[in-house]
Curated annotation (Swiss-Prot):
Name of the protein in question: Methionyl-tRNA formyltransferase
Molecular function in Gene Ontology: methionyl-tRNA formyltransferase activity
InterPro entries, alphabetized: Fmt, Formyl_trans_C, Formyl_trans_C_sf, Formyl_transf_N, Formyl_transf_N_sf, Formyl_transferase-like_C_sf, Met-tRNA-FMT_C, Met-tRNA-FMT_N
UniProt similarity note: Belongs to the Fmt family.
Catalytic activity: L-methionyl-tRNA(fMet) + (6R)-10-formyltetrahydrofolate = N-formyl-L-methionyl-tRNA(fMet) + (6S)-5,6,7,8-tetrahydrofolate + H(+)
Cellular-component GO terms for this entry: cytosol
HAMAP family: Formyl_trans
Gene3D superfamilies in UniProt: Formyl transferase, C-terminal domain, Formyl transferase, N-terminal domain
Name of encoding gene: fmt
Enzyme Commission code(s) on record: 2.1.2.9
Pfam families, sorted: Formyl_trans_C, Formyl_trans_N
Length: 323
């Protein structure tokens, strides 16, 4: 059997799972893997490879890491590989916009996008699906065009978002959904057995990359909205508030009470309303939020009991979180 020649482009673990599926299927000749440059991470600012690069190196695939594709040496190398007209492009969470001339010369160009398009075009679809309280998420295999995530849809599959899910768990689930969907549908698509369907432009929504401002918790929102925001940013970029003028990250929480604050007992949003040796509850614009896992400035992530036994002893009922 002649293997389909492709160039794979992707960056995080989601993409590495998809790439591993392509490798293991033994149906594809992967001429090159394109991923983001190594980045410095953590307090020690250690240089770290992307999960896609780590995987590619273990199986001796050539790796290209352009800071930006347009005008780069790597772009020239990719164009050379594509010139035969027999090589396709497969992407999954690459993190860069592909120049149009790549799409022009590739045999085909398909993207594994982690949303049920046309909802959540953009770089943070899983984050926004959770933050918006969606009950399901999914993956779309789609044709790539010059407009971001706007190409015709080849296939879709969905999976539930459970109350206990966060960005990390959904990334993992959807990576396998995307892997299986791509492996099932790409051969059929290339053989002409599947016809791509246009997206309904009236139903388009966007999920741009999370801004630093978006990470801040607005305590005037409801407990349910803040709960969704916290899990929609765990484990990255992590929702945060201020305590004593310093950043206070919240990784996990739960809605303790969704009753609307009434005029007989008005609570100030962001105010600590209950503190025991094992729990900490905060008033919101509507309802009470219980904090479960936090990270004070300059400290490691910890469960709420550890926090309350240590630094949290300084926190008192009536104290206010936020600006």
């Amino acid at each position: 059997m002649t293997k389909t020649k492709i160039i794979f482009m992707g960056t995080p673990q989601f993409a590495a799972t998809v790439l591993k599926g392509l490798i293991d299927s033994n149906q594809y000749e992967i001429l090159a893997v394109v991923t983001q440059p190594d980045r410095k991470v953590g307090r020690k600012q250690e240089l770290r490879m992307t999960p896609v690069k780590e995987l590619a190196l273990t199986v001796n695939l050539p790796v290209l890491q352009p800071e930006k594709l347009s005008g780069s040496v790597e772009m020239t190398q990719i164009m050379t590989l594509l010139e035969s007209g027999e090589v396709g492009i497969v992407t999954a969470a690459f993190g860069q916009f592909l120049p149009g001339k790549l799409l022009d010369v590739a045999r085909f160009a398909v993207n594994t996008h982690a949303s049920l398009l046309p909802k959540y075009r953009g770089g943070a679809p899983i984050h926004y699906a959770i933050m918006n309280g969606e009950k399901e998420a999914g993956v779309t295999i789609m044709e790539m065009i010059r407009k971001m995530d706007a190409g015709d849809m080849i296939a879709q599959n969905s999976t539930p978002i459970l109350e206990e899910d966060n960005v990390g768990t959904m990334f993992e689930k959807l990576a396998f959904v995307g892997r299986d969907l791509l492996l099932e549908t790409l051969p059929k698509y290339l053989e002409g057995q599947l016809k791509a369907q246009a997206q309904n432009e009236d139903e388009v929504t966007f999920s741009p990359n999370i801004s630093p401002e978006e990470e801040k918790i607005d305590w005037n929102k409801s407990a349910r909205e803040i709960f969704n925001k916290v899990r929609g940013m765990n484990p990255f970029p992590v929702a945060h508030t201020l305590w004593n003028g310093e950043r206070f990250k919240i990784y996990e929480s739960k809605v303790a009470d969704e009753i609307v604050n009434n005029s007989d007992n008005p609570l100030q949003a962001g105010q600590i309303v209950e503190k025991t040796k094992k729990s900490l509850k905060v008033a919101t614009g509507n309802g009470i939020l219980e904090l479960l896992t936090v990270q004070p400035a300059g400290k490691p992530k910890m469960d709420i009991v550890s926090f309350l036994n240590g630094l949290g002893q300084k926190m008192q009922v009536g104290d206010k979180l936020g600006d």
